[in-house]
């Protein structure tokens, strides 16, 4: 029995957009890996740590809708781990999976784990284990900020492992720590229409993820109204997206900056991400406690 290429592309696209929407892992501008002469201590001052708005014990849950179909679910939790040589550390765990009838059509089980320095928010270790249909990938990164390097171990399916070491700017993030670094940004100090950026290391490449502040907007979820900051990642067009502004993320316009809702138009429809549960918030708001 032959599979339908069109359907397979659709399902692979949904798996990709679920991952991309949640992680904000979308390439804005790919750049070559930097050499030591180009590294500066804080190339992106907006992301210099200014006091964390999250804490161990926080957990967030999201659902993903493709049209009227409940396609997937993701859970994020923050826990305290044993202190390392760097001092107190936190682990951010992200687990995503397709749900309901959709998982029988295209099964997705993804795990992302980032261990970060509690003081700076910078990543120390990153683990990614994804299973999407017949595609499997495992990645492990070890960050060494005394040398501004990341040691990468990548294994795809049954292929041999690829091990390499890369130079990075000091404030680089993995795809999970980047999501939480965004929450610590003082968005009230960034003007509507302005663009900020964060250096991101993903898939053995370093690039700058650009984000446009699109202003303040109120949205309604489950009969409640929430005031949100609208953030637009500048995404790469082509395989999934038609336009570079086809992904919009809404974060709460309070001190927590929780990603509340995201919407993206792709080549074959629209996908929505909604926060369904929040607890253990460091700064309680109208959604969580």
Sequence positions of predicted segments:
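Hydrophobic, well-structured mid-protein blocks that either form specific transmembrane helices
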Residues: 139-179, 183
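Acidic, serine/threonine-rich low-complexity disordered tracts
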Residues: 30-145, 184-289
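N-terminal acidic, proline/glycine-rich, low-complexity intrinsically disordered segments
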Residues: 2, 29-30
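Compositionally biased regions
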Residues: 4-5, 20-21, 53
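Sec/Tat signal peptide C-region and signal peptidase I cleavage site
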Residues: 24-28
């Amino acid at each position: 029995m032959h599979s339908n290429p069109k359907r397979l592309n659709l399902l692979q696209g949904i798996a990709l957009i679920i991952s991309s929407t949640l992680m904000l892992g979308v390439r804005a501008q790919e750049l070559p890996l930097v050499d030591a002469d180009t590294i500066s201590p804080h190339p992106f001052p907006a992301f210099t740590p200014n006091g964390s708005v999250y804490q161990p014990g926080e957990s967030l849950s999201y659902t993903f809708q493709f049209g009227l179909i409940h396609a997937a679910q993701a859970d994020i939790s923050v826990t305290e781990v044993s202190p390392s040589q760097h001092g107190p550390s936190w682990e951010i765990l992200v687990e995503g999976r397709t749900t309901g009838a959709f998982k029988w059509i295209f099964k997705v089980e993804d795990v992302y784990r980032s261990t970060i320095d509690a003081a700076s928010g910078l990543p120390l270790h990153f683990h990614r284990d994804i299973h999407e249909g017949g595609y499997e990938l495992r990645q492990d990164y070890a960050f060494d900020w005394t040398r501004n390097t990341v040691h990468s171990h990548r294994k795809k399916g049954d292929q041999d492992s690829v091990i390499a070491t890369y130079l990075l700017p000091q404030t680089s993030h993995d795809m999970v720590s980047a999501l939480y670094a965004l929450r610590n940004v003082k968005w009230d100090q960034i003007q509507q229409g302005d663009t900020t950026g964060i250096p991101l290391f993903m898939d053995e490449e370093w690039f700058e993820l650009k984000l446009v502040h699109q202003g303040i907007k109120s949205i309604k979820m489950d009969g409640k109204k929430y005031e949100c900051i609208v953030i637009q990642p500048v995404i790469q067009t082509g395989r999934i997206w038609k336009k570079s502004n086809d992904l919009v993320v809404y974060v709460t316009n309070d001190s927590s900056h929780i990603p509340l809702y995201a919407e993206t138009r792709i080549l074959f429809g629209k996908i929505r991400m909604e926060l369904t549960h929040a607890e253990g918030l460091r700064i309680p708001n109208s959604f969580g406690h």
